[in-house]
Amino acid sequence: MRFQALLFDCDGVLVDSEPITHGVLHEMLHEQGWRLSMEECVHHFMGRAVKDQRAVIEHHTQQPLTEAWLTAFRERRNQALEAQLQAVPHIHAAMAALQPVFAERMACASGADRFKVELQLKKVALHAYFAGRIFSGHEMPRSKPAPDVYLAAAEHLAVPTADCLVIEDTPTGVTAGVAAGAEVWAYVAPDAQDMARHIEVLRQAGAQRVFHSMADLPGLIQAA
């Protein structure tokens, strides 16, 4: 095993939140007059902070993206997450196996706002694995695909990024991890749509391994 630290994205890696978040966002953008499909919503916002897509939203809605709207989105999103959120399958067993090996050298580095990340990890009983080691792209000079959140996490752990393994699920996140200087593995759910194309895009972004079950992760890391 060659890795000294593990840096996990949150959405789509630890929690199955993206369908919930995209559902709320899709509904609210329709209310603003942008009649995009769910596929278009995923294309524009997967792995990206909504606030960072301001220009795209304003172009299609012909309305300013206000702080009041962003606040309303977060409130509706958080309510939906509280009601519906589940952990990614097998992640609890994976974390239980990895924690004795890495202990406090595991961090969560998300592009989402801190409140959402903390809410989600607590909801699915994963927060204890990352307590004190949760990093939000909203608190960085730049969010993903810039490497800032991963650089901050590695610095906090006092581990060179070259010795860190990043677990991601989107091209945006993979790009961020690679730019930070870490090795990046990509998780793709076994029921993912258009899987071959999705894997190709992740590899093009720099993912060095793609895997399909969190149950496999501890063994893959041990063998690396």
List each language-model region with its residue ranges.
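Asp-based, Mg2+/Mn2+-dependent phosphohydrolase catalytic module
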Residues: 1-4, 96, 102, 113-224
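N-terminal helical cap/lid subdomain that shapes the substrate entry/recognition surface
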Residues: 2-100, 115-118
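Ser/Thr-glycine-rich phosphate-binding loops at phosphate-binding pockets of nucleotides
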Residues: 13, 17, 110, 173
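Conserved SAM-binding loop
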Residues: 14, 106, 166-167
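Structural motif
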Residues: 44, 109-111, 167
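Electropositive, surface-exposed helix/loop patches at the edges of structured domains
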Residues: 72-80, 105-106, 220-224
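Residue-level marker of regulatory loop/turn positions in helix-turn-helix DNA-binding domains and
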Residues: 87, 109, 142
